[in-house]
A protein has these predicted regions:
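Hydrophobic transmembrane alpha-helical segments in integral membrane proteins
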Residues: 1-19
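Juxtamembrane segments at transmembrane-helix boundaries
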Residues: 19-39, 53-184
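N-terminal, Lys/Arg-enriched amphipathic/low-complexity engagement segments
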Residues: 44, 48-51
């Protein structure tokens, strides 16, 4: 039976590794929801609970291949994203894949920093040290990204000119996503 502290560590990590990216990826499309905001927030809460369950599964049942857990989480996230947002496929795919790549980068950078600071703890899974470092890196990266989304990215998404570029530009972050998937 896992102890309470390890359980809380897994839960905090699970939410810290999902919620900032989920919220930031839907931010530019906040005026294009298919459902009322209350329903969207209910879906977000449900995804948070599912992510906690998946994080607990990953932390305390390490014999299960991590690719299965990753695929389940990814499919749920993609299904939510495309079910809740009503926008051009290319715009949504580009945003979702770019945010996923940023998430992967933040996780990798955080693990490297943890290894430099606390090498013994870096070899263990779901440790508070990694979660704290990851949250600090998220703040450093995602706060400026939020302002970029607000001032630059969202107005570009709302422009009517250049719509044809969105048909193919999502392939660029997809390429990086595939590379991340096979390297990790």
């Amino acid at each position: 039976m896992p102890d309470v502290l390890n359980l809380v560590e897994a839960w905090i990590y699970s939410l810290a590794n999902l919620m900032p990216y989920l919220l930031l990826s839907i931010y530019p499309f906040r005026h294009n929801f298919r459902f009322p905001r209350f329903i969207v927030w209910m879906f977000i809460a449900l995804i948070g609970v599912i992510q906690i369950i998946l994080g607990t599964w990953a932390a305390f049942f390490p014999d299960t291949p991590s690719s299965i857990k990753s695929i389940v989480s990814t499919v749920i996230y993609i299904a939510f994203y495309f079910a809740v947002i009503k926008a051009h496929f290319g715009k949504m795919a580009f945003t979702l894949l770019a945010m996923s790549n940023i998430c992967n980068m933040i996780v990798a950078v955080s693990k490297c920093i943890e290894y430099r600071i606390l090498p013994e703890m870096a070899m263990q899974g779901y440790r508070w040290s990694f979660t704290v470092i990851m949250i600090v890196v998220e703040i450093i990266v995602l706060v400026p990204l939020y302002f970029y989304f607000k001032k630059v990215y969202e107005p570009v998404l709302n422009q009517e000119t250049g719509q044809s570029m969105w048909r193919f530009i999502w392939v660029v972050p997809l390429t990086f996503y595939i590379v991340w998937y096979y390297i990790a």
